[in-house]
Amino acid sequence: MKYIFLDTNIVIDFLADRKPFSLAAAKLFNFSILGKAKIYISAVSYNNIYYILKQSHSSVEAIKLLDELSEMTEITDVTKSIIKKSLKSDFKDFEDAIQYNCALTLTKIDFIVTRDTKDFKKSTLSIMTPEEAVSLLENSSR
């Protein structure tokens, strides 16, 4: 089993069915359903995901999708310590700094999946695009 931290953009791709990105994102969630991956997302992602989903879904539909998401993933806490580290980090994007510092708190994490790999250049964790992660998971399943 692989332990994967998903950046917010990947979750939005999946839930909002943003083509062409949703295909790889859906495959990642399928690996989770099959027990081949455990997916982590940060708690702070929920408000960002809700905001984006509300642009194309009713509030009730967006809440339903977030509830389903909570059943498919592990949610990492965003603590004061994570915020402080993120504020002092070398990351250019504050939200990415929060995501990264949340991932660092996990005892088991194989990689972070994001479409914004350039924003994670300072990462000490492995960073993959959704397509790279899908390829790795497909090859490790054989």
Region spans (language model):
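Short, well-structured N-terminal submotif of metal-dependent ribonuclease cores
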Residues: 1-41, 54-61, 122, 132-142
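A short, flexible beta-alpha/helix-coil linker loop
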Residues: 11-12, 46, 83, 119
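Hydrophobic helix-cap positions at the C-terminus of alpha-helices
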Residues: 31-32, 69, 106
